[in-house]
């Protein structure tokens, strides 16, 4: 017997427009109506982003966020955190941010993101998006 239905969001629960469709929302409600099956979200997104998407359809679920670093109950209470401590985080930043190179350090926390070089981040994101646009418009693919 199924006791739990867990779903990722991006590329799974969300449609190509990156939202939960009305049909999917109704399927979740139907699943949740079966009191013996728990529905939860497991995502790389932070809690607020995942919760906002659920709120668009008045859905509730436990959420495993930030690639498993935090778990939240249905009411949004933080249950567990599995995070690097500050000293380990600083060590990682120092190791990867090599002087004289264009090393980009990007860290996700429960409350947002840290980027060591915002200008470099923007340039790399623009280059990535331009490559994606070119690939999307390439008729030979």
Over which residues does each language-model region extend?
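Glycine-rich loop at the start of a catalytic domain that most often binds anionic cofactors/ligands
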Residues: 52-60, 118-122
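HAD-like small-molecule phosphatases
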Residues: 69-141
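Basic, amphipathic juxtamembrane/active-site segments
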Residues: 17-33
